[in-house]
Amino acid sequence: MAKEDTLEFPGVVKELLPNATFRVELENGHEIIAHTAGKMRKNRIRVLAGDKVQVEMTPYDLTKGRINYRFK
């Protein structure tokens, strides 16, 4: 799949779940399950409840996503 096929949305982390997954509420009101991107894990960027994040999703499954940026 090409990178152009991803959808990006800003959101807020609502809950921490096991295995580095998070419940994220998007700006449009939808709640999804998201995991951290590999570069965020490698650089040990912490994501806590209440953080504003950028979530990337595929158009095929709009219930799961990947957190690729945490806003400061």
From Swiss-Prot:
UniProt KW RNA-binding keyword: yes
Domain S1-like: 1-72
Record flagged with keyword Cytoplasm: yes
Main location per the UniProt record: cytoplasm
S-S bridge residues: none
Locations listed in the record: Cytoplasm
Keywords: Cytoplasm, Initiation factor, Plasmid, Protein biosynthesis, RNA-binding, rRNA-binding
Entry-linked SUPFAM superfamilies: Nucleic acid-binding proteins (SSF50249)
GO CC annotations on file: cytosol
GO function term, MF aspect, one: rRNA binding
Superkingdom per UniProt: Bacteria
Function noted in UniProt: One of the essential components for the initiation of protein synthesis. Stabilizes the binding of IF-2 and IF-3 on the 30S subunit to which N-formylmethionyl-tRNA(fMet) subsequently binds. Helps modulate mRNA selection, yielding the 30S pre-initiation complex (PIC). Upon addition of the 50S ribosomal subunit IF-1, IF-2 and IF-3 are released leaving the mature 70S translation initiation complex.
Description of how the protein assembles with itself and partners: Component of the 30S ribosomal translation pre-initiation complex which assembles on the 30S ribosome in the order IF-2 and IF-3, IF-1 and N-formylmethionyl-tRNA(fMet); mRNA recruitment can occur at any time during PIC assembly.
Family: Belongs to the IF-1 family.
Protein name: Translation initiation factor IF-1
Natural source organism: Ruegeria pomeroyi (strain ATCC 700808 / DSM 15171 / DSS-3)
